From Swiss-Prot:
Keywords: Allosteric enzyme, Amino-acid biosynthesis, Branched-chain amino acid biosynthesis, Chloroplast, Isoleucine biosynthesis, Lyase, Plastid, Pyridoxal phosphate, Repeat, Transit peptide. This is Threonine dehydratase biosynthetic, chloroplastic. It is an enzyme of class 4 (lyase). Disulfide bonds: none annotated. Gene3D superfamilies: 3.40.50.1100, Biosynthetic Threonine Deaminase, Domain 3. Pathway: Amino-acid biosynthesis; L-isoleucine biosynthesis; 2-oxobutanoate from L-threonine: step 1/1. It comes from Cicer arietinum. Its EC number is 4.3.1.19. It is found in: Plastid, Chloroplast. The modification N6-(pyridoxal phosphate)lysine is found at K139. GO terms for molecular function: L-serine ammonia-lyase activity; threonine deaminase activity. Belongs to the serine/threonine dehydratase family. The keyword Chloroplast applies. The lineage of its organism: Eukaryota, Viridiplantae, Streptophyta, Embryophyta, Tracheophyta.
Length: 590
């Protein structure tokens, strides 16, 4: 199992600044407490930590790079790759994968070489295009493989599942008028966006809306299953489902002669369990890399804890990987077949989506791009090897593209977001603009005069390469200007540019952020607020996924907020009280 280092983490340099938020480091001494006690399970600072890979050697001989990892020399590759004709001589798992009937409803998705990314990363980087399937994700494979093994009696009664994502479309797809004539009942949270509800209904499924969360919907699905005698089709917790997902590994193995590593996005673990189990029996020299969003890293937490552990809050930006606890069966399957783990931040995922678009004018979903974001890490220090990233889906909510585009330019290192204070004097703005020269240019400017003592300026700068931003900050500080680099402060990206209005001239302000479902009852939310609180700032932002953010500044004593904490907890919405966020201090304090 993984061990925790007591040393401070050392951030490794990046192969490319394509994602400035993909990190590998030794876990800090308080790694476990950070997971379990933070309001956000992984706070902003946690983006700099990742579970240390336990099957890759350390190389301390690289000057200036502590703890760099180098690839273990692999065994000789298997020359004759198995086919269905050879399956009688293979273990049961491989035999079932090779004989899977999934091709009744799916196509063998292509593997494409990404020329631009390959040149930039110095490897042969391929993408497995599961976004080309009929429901625009890999989620047809597992459900159909399981349902095709059901008896006629079970098919006649119908099936049921709970989902708010791609699985909800994968289960009903083969039904009415298609391969399996069966009724599908899909239980979905009431907070599910209409675009997904409409998509599932269009496939002929009976949609049941229940609860505010996936867990509540899942509980109700179990009750309906027992009541109506339906067969449950789980999204990942079944051997037949995992074998269906394993057909992706079989295809990759046939499509590329030599594969050094496969980067797999992980939610509940069905995809990684299926792909990893296949490769470790056929090509054990191929490294299988888990890629998780750092605010939804249920597998990383469980591996570190050496048992399945549940995240208290889960970020929904990469909604296809939004799972609070890794599956029991999938976690057990992955223990001996996963080689490394990488955690990626949201702006890194956004940068990966942009790279896929630049490469072939295709837009993939956030969880689907996680595997590509994981490749940006400097962890491997390898050249000319064959790497594969699985693009698991393309069911992107159009509204979310706005947030993705904001994060992408910052995550890719093409732009930087700076905040600064200036004396409120005539000509200071012109002086500031004169500090920007050479290859740097403005893409957005927000300026507000607040007093003769101070004015606020927020700059979005276009830059190439990234190192110019450090020179820019040094130059501004040398000129006597206070500068904050808030490029990777997600709150600043979402809200900060809209808060440049100056101080409210009140004391004891406290900054609070709530994460609420997109369809949450706003009246219920406001009723719990204390009548003694003076609300000095309020901003609501729908982010186009399963959540929206409410940013508030409250003029109140902190002790009263602590007293009211139980009532806030009763709402069931994640929140964070923060008096020290740089964007908050820049925008609303004097």
């Amino acid at each position: 199992m993984l061990s925790t280092s007591t040393t401070n983490s050392s951030i490794l340099p990046f192969r490319s600044r394509a994602s400035s938020s993909t990190f590998i480091a030794r876990p800090p001494a308080n790694f476990n407490s950070i997971f379990t006690t933070s309001v956000r399970v992984f706070p902003i600072s946690m983006s700099r930590y990742c579970v240390f890979p336990h099957t890759w050697e350390r190389d301390h001989n690289v000057p200036g790079v502590p703890g760099v990892l180098r690839k273990v020399v692999p065994a000789a590759p298997i020359k004759n790759k198995p086919t269905c004709a050879d399956s009688d001589e293979l273990p049961e798992y491989l035999r079932d994968v090779l004989r899977s009937p999934v091709y009744d409803v799916v196509v063998e998705s292509p593997v494409e070489l990404t020329e631009r990314l390959s040149d930039r990363l110095g490897v042969n980087f391929y993408v497995k295009r599961e976004d080309r399937q009929r429901v625009f994700s890999f989620k047809l494979r597992g459900p159909y493989n399981m349902m095709s093994s059901l008896s006629h009696e079970e098919i006649d009664k119908g099936v049921i599942t709970a989902s708010a994502g791609n699985h909800a479309q994968g289960v009903p797809f083969p039904f009415p008028g298609r391969r399996l004539k069966c009724v599908a009942k899909i239980v979905m949270p009431t907070t599910t966006p209409n675009i997904k509800l409409d998509g599932v209904r269009a496939l002929g499924a009976d949609v049941v809306l229940w609860g505010h969360t996936f867990d509540e919907a899942k509980t109700h699905a179990v009750e309906l299953c027992e009541k109506d005698g339906l067969r449950t089709i789980p999204p990942f917790e079944d051997p037949a489902v995992i074998k269906g997902q394993g057909t992706i590994g079989s295809e990759i193995n046939r499509q590329i002669k030599r594969i050094d590593a496969v980067f797999v996005p992980v939610g509940g673990g069905g995809l990684i369990a299926g792909v990893a189990a296949f490769f470790k029996q056929i090509a054990p020299q191929t490294k299988i890399i888990v890629v998780e969003p750092y605010d939804a890293a249920s597998m990383a937490l469980s591996v570190h804890a050496e048992h399945r552990a549940k995240l208290s809050n889960v970020d929904t930006f990469a909604d296809g990987a939004t799972v609070a606890v890794i599956g029991e069966y999938t976690f057990a399957r992955c223990q001996d077949v996963v080689d490394a783990m990488v955690l990626v931040a949201n702006d890194g995922i956004g940068a990966a989506i942009k790279d896929v678009f630049d490469e072939g004018r295709n837009i993939v979903e956030t969880s689907g791009a996680a595997g590509i974001a994981g490749m940006y890490c400097e962890m491997y220090r390898i050249k000319n090897d064959n790497m594969v990233g699985i693009v698991s889906g393309a069911n992107m909510n159009f509204r979310k593209l706005h947030k993705v585009s904001e994060l992408a330019v910052l995550g890719s290192g093409h732009e930087a977001l700076l905040g600064t204070y200036m004396p409120g004097q005539k000509g200071c703005f012109k002086t500031m603009a004169g500090l920007v020269h050479g290859s740097l240019s403005f893409t957005e400017i927000t300026y507000r005069f607040t007093s003769h003592r101070r004015s606020i300026l927020v700059l979005m700068l276009k830059l190439e390469p990234w190192r110019y931003i450090e020179k820019m900050i040094e130059m501004m500080k040398y000129s006597g200007v206070t500068v904050l680099n808030i490029s990777h402060n997600e709150l600043a990206v979402i809200h900060g540019k809209h808060l440049v209005g100056g101080s409210a001239k009140v004391s004891d302000e406290v900054f609070v952020e709530f994460i609420i479902p997109e369809k949450a009852d706003l009246k219920k939310f406001l009723e719990v607020l204390s009548p003694h609180w003076n609300l000095t700032l309020y901003r609501y932002r729908n982010q186009g996924d399963l959540k929206a953010t409410i940013l508030m500044v409250i003029a109140s004593f902190l002790c009263e907020i602590v007293i009211r904490k139980n009532q806030i907890d009763d709402l069931g919405y994640p929140y964070e009280i923060d008096q020290y966020n740089d964007a908050f201090n820049l925008a609303v304090t004097e």
